[in-house]
Structures are given as C-alpha cells and as structure tokens.
From Swiss-Prot:
Pfam families: Anticodon_1, tRNA-synt_1, tRNA-synt_1_2, tRNA-synt_1g. Belongs to the class-I aminoacyl-tRNA synthetase family. GO terms for biological process: leucyl-tRNA aminoacylation. It catalyses: tRNA(Leu) + L-leucine + ATP = L-leucyl-tRNA(Leu) + AMP + diphosphate. GO terms for cellular component: cytosol. Transmembrane segments: none annotated. This is Leucine--tRNA ligase. GO terms for molecular function: aminoacyl-tRNA deacylase activity; ATP binding; leucine-tRNA ligase activity. It is an enzyme of class 6 (ligase). The keyword ATP-binding applies. It comes from Lactobacillus acidophilus (strain ATCC 700396 / NCK56 / N2 / NCFM). Its main location: cytoplasm. It is found in: Cytoplasm.
Amino acid sequence: MYNHKVVEKKWQDYWAKHDTFKTGTDSNKKNYYALDMFPFPSGKGLHVGHPEGYTATDIVSRMKRAQGYNVLHPMGWDAFGLPTEQYALKTGEDPEVVTKNNIANFKRQLNKLGFSYDWDREVTTSDPNYYKWTQWVFEQMYKKGLAYEAEVPVNWSPDLGTVVANEEIVDGKTERGGYPVYRRNMRQWMLKMTAYADRLLEDLDDLDWPEPVKEMQRNWIGRSLGAQVTFKIKDSDKTFDIFTTRPDTLFGCSYTVLAPENKLVQEITTDAQRDEVNAYIKKIESKSDLERTDLNKDKTGVFTGAYAINPVNGKEVPIWISDYVLASYGTGAVMAVPAHDERDYAFATKFGLPINPVLEGGDITKEAFTEDGPHINSEFLNGLNIKDAKKKMVEWLEEHNCGEKKVNYKLRDWDFSRQRYWGEPIPVIHWEDGETTLVPEDQLPLRLPHATDIKPSGTPESPLANLTDWVNVVDENGRKGKRETNTMPNWAGSSWYYLRYVDPHNDKELADYDLLKKWLPVDLYIGGAEHAVRHLLYARFWHKVLYDLGVVPTKEPFQRLYNQGLILKNHEKMSKSKGNVVNPDDVIDEYGADSLRMYEMFMGPLDASIDWDDNGPASTKKFLDRVWRLFVNDLDLKAIPQERIVDENDGELDKVYAETVKKVTEDFDALHFNTAISQMMVFMNAAQKAKTIPREYAEGFVKLLAPVAPHMMEEIWQVFGHDESISYAEWSTYDPAKLVESTVEIMVQVNGKLRGKFQAAKDADRDEVQKQAMELPHVQKFLEGKDVKKVIVVPNKIVNIVAK
C-alpha cells in the first residue's frame, strides 16, 4: 500500500542530495525562466492559498525540464517591512532573528510541498550582500537626478511612527492596526517615476499580461491631453494654473477649487473666511487621497472669500477649497464647469453656485450634460464640436499668453522614505555645510546597525536617529555630517530581485550582463492581482532605469504574467483573525503533498477565486491511489509493475493516449491545469478497462502526471526499473495519426428503418462494408422472403438496403 509520508520524504531527500533542480547551463538548450512572486516571511507561515501559484509554476518548470530546456526556477524572501518590525516591538525579539526563524519555517513548508526550486539561488532582501545592490541602484538613480529630496504632503501615522502609502489606508485609518492617519508635509526621498510615465504606458502593449492588470496600470499612470490655463487672482499680482482636458468649456467656468494644502490658500483667504477655512483644513487632514477623490462621497468645501479672473471672458469666479482636489495631482487647482461635469454639478448644486451651459443639449436643471454638442455662449467657439473647439481654444490661450497645450499624468513620483528601522538604510550623508553626498560605492553595503530600541521616534526621523554612533560622521577634513535616518520602503528589494536570481553570488556587479541576456525577460511570472499597480509598476520602473544604465538587456522584466485566484474558506479570504486558515502541514500529513497539489490545480481555473473544500484532498488522494494500484503490484515485499503492463500494443488505447498527451501538454502551457487533470482521468478510466496497457503508454502517462504529483510518479518510475529521476525523462510525445479513429460505426437501414450497426475499418472497401451489413443477423431477419433491389453505401456512415 502506498505510504505518502515515507515516499514523499524519500524523494525530497533525494532531490536535495542530488541537486536535482540545479539550473541547467547547457548552451545547446533553450532557457526558460519561471518565477513566483516571492513571499513576505510572516510568522504565520503558509496557508493553503499560497501553494496555488507556486504549484502552477512548478508544473510548468517540471514540464519544461522534461522538454529539454534549461530551467531557472528560484525562490527567495521579501524580508524587510513593517509587519516584522511591529512583531519585534510587541515581543521584544530582534527583527533579524524573527526573520530568520520565519524563513526557516516557510522553507520547511515549501520543501514539504515538493517544489523544484534551485535553492542555490535563494535571495533575502534583508541580507547585506543583497541590499548592497538595492543601495547601488538608488545611488545610480541619485546620480541621474531620479532620486531627490522634497517637502511633500504625506499620510503620517503617529502610532506606527511612519508614513504610509495611500493604498495602505482604509476609512482614514491604517490597514495594519487601524491607527489614525494625518496629512502633513514632510521631507521625503522621492524617485522620479513620472520621468518614465510615457514608456511605462506604451510598453504595456507588447506584454502578454492579463488585460485587467494592463488597464489598471494605464489608469494609474492616467495620461491625459489637455491645456494648462493661468488664472489671475482679483486685486492681486498672484496667479495659479489649472490643468483641464476640456479647455473648450472655459467660457462655462463659474468657480475654481484649490486643494486645501495649496500654499496660496493661506495667502488669499479673507479675514472673514479664515476661521472656516482653517477648521475645514483641520477636519480633512486624516483623509487619504483615495477617500478624498471617491466619486460617490458627499461633496464638502469652503469659500476662501477670494476671486479669480476667467482669462477668456474677464469674469470674476469665486475660489473655493475642497478635499477632492489634491495638491499632489496636476497643479493642485481645478476650474469647475458644473453644466458639463457631474462632480462640479453636484458641488455647485449643493453650494448654490452658477451653472452656465456652453454645449447645446440636455437639461441642466436636472443634471450635467456630459455628451458632445455644438458650443453655445462661447463667443469664437460657438457652433464648433468638441475636437475643433479644443484646438481653437488652445490656440487662443497660447496667443494671449495665458495657457498652453499640456499632457498630464495621474502618476506621482514614488515616496521612497519610511521612518522605520527594519528597512534598507538610504546611503546618503547630510553635511553641516548643507552638502548632501552618497556613501562611496566601495563602502556599500551601508549596513543596518544592530539596535535594541526600535520604537518609533514619533518624529519624522526613524529609530536610527537614536543610534548617534552610527548617525554622526566626520570626513577627513573634520567636516561633521549625519547619515540619512529614513529607510527604504519594503517595495525596494522586490523591485529587482528577479535579476539577482540570475547571478546571486556575484560580488562585483548586480548581475552579469551576458547571463541576464540568456534569461531575460522572465518567461512566466505568477502572483496575486493585488500587486498590479505597486510592485509590478515599481519593478517595471526600476527595470527601465537599469536598461538606460546598460545594466539589463531588455526593456521589460516580465514577458508573461498570470494572476492566480484566491482560495477562500467559507467564501471569505483566509486570515488568522477570522480563524479560517487551513494549514498545508495538516493537509500534507493526512493526504500527502501530491494530493494537495493536485486538488489545488483541479479546483477550477487557476485565475478563479474558489472556496476550499475540506474533502477535496481526500478525493484527489483516491484518484492517485487508483493510479498506484493500476501500475504497481506491491503485495509482496518488493513493488513490481502490474502484469497488465506489457511490451506489446494491441491498439486499444492508441487514440485516448494520443489525445491525453496532446491535451495535457497544451493545457499545461496554457495554465489550464484543471482540464489537463480531467483528461488524465479520462485516460485512467480507459486504461482500467483495457485488457493490457502498453509499457510505452504507462510510462508516458506517468511522465505527464509527474509535474502535478512528483513524489508518487518518481516512485512508480523507479518501480518501472529506471535508476534516474523522472525529472529529466524526455516529455511524452504522440503520433498525430492516432488522434483519428481507426474504426467507424456504420448504421444499417432496411427500407429506411434502422435495423443494425457494426464497427468497420475506416475507409474500408465498399464491397466489404456491404458484405458485413448483409451478414448482420438482425438485418437478415428483415430481408427474409424479399428481393434486394438496391444497396447504397455512404462511406464511413451508412448502408441503406432497399428490398421488396
């Protein structure tokens, strides 16, 4: 009887001892790079949702090795970050020790699942030998003017003691811990991602990525063509610019809105309005950008008491502030045309502001008219459509020096500072004379110093500020300086890790260019869709910078991306707080890793979110036990192949075997694992009914199932008499001629009524088919005492006998 505990440990030990999955370097073979999004090693370990994507890449990796490719299939750890630091603060443990322990647990779990990783290429983002190169990339960006310091509005969480990203805020509180967040201006390191906006947008077209992910990135970059218009402030020499995609509606502008953080606000607010304006600014400081720009939220705002002059008609328009305008987007100011914009209409209606139509159509007493129509109330634009009116208005603005054609982006520069301990130190020194310099490259890595007190400082400095021996430096001329105390965000190390896997032990450069040329771009990258606009955009940005530096040979990092769905429990995402986590260790102990791998691939399409069924692994174990019994006789002390496995081929399984090899190969390539497994079940049913199973087909089937259930298939392969691992046994092939039926079913009619049917060789001779039809006992019964007048034979289909 098959014992999964014994067999799985045996083969995991064998693979480790023999370096079975060491990346091939045969220059005569093609290369294939299959990559998983590496995990953050949390204290909770893996749950059964994690192995879904990992199993998918593992199946493809195992197939590609068998197809004769050199395969790079690595794994590593995204080890810096806030959760480890929070845990360390709570328990008093060292974050480095916490990380090491968590990695050991994750690695144990991954190895129990039988994944074919090349562990010689393992990387950890918190390892100084790794983050030396993260710091090196930062330094190259600084030299190119892509890393800079700026005072920017940020989401500040005093409780976490750091800035948090917009995406990490829910209902004005931090996603992690539910702490309040406040808007404040802080000195931050920024990366100039906006310099790459056009390339990030255009190069999406060439990628084999899910369309929804590409669309999310397009929207995040948010390129829009329009005009920048300058408004003068009444009774003042001050001006402000607005960006609009609809310069043709400028005649309809009836008010303007500034972001509450806009520096102009305090300068132009009248004494009568100052208290109200300041109260409003205080009220909205805990809202994230995402909340503020939510289209469905109630519109709020306050009049500043000041007026601007509409440049096209000289009319005075009131200047308001509202939280839906962000200082960090565009110019931090907008013009409002309520007659033709839904948000402006709702705002104007609520606060009783004028609504001036400039397009013909609709009923603006009921709603904004947002479609096209001839321009009205617009002097030199009257009668024109939108396209022509836009062009003419931009020409007018440029001619009168109060505006110009402009491209705008939603994309912002990347806020690259965190006020925490557990992250990569930023390799910068601030000197007392105001100069800022980089740590010399030959002194990298700038190591994160060991610290016993990593509590947030509560100031814009990280806990590193407390380590005065590390912070304070003196150069050879006696000039004093301080090290940068902010650290990098946890997205830094994950922006380039796939490059380091190619050459993980290189201490002279990030990775050898010729090796990168052999392996890039990544052929298959599988991970969660939640990374669409953060990690995937950051990695593309870093890659393009490195391409411009001549460090990498390709414009894009990941050629093919696939997002696995979620595995839910009781229709909810698994989480410790909900108590609905299924631990893979328990499933493996009871049913085996092969059963778990197979169940996760058979649950449904890889990209679907599906509910976990506790009985699922039991059903795939039953199937695998059937496979074992079909091929292996283990009744005696030594397991041997079943007697039904023979060297001869009677042809009975030809067609189903050819269909199975074809479908499984195509489905594995297309990541349709559930339908591939269904086809293997079809073959199993046919093989169980067959009198004998040709050895060629038995071995071929085992090779097809090996990527899904590698431990059992290694064992069966050994029972079949092979000394080598199945991992490099040549992938199964089929004869296309055998996909076609060798026999056909012929219907026999007597005087138009069906009286019998029989099997005949395909394309058999007409006379032979007619003879077989006439000899059928049931047909002869209906021909007794009659003369056969005519016999019509339709090849491969029907014999029609006319008798009287």
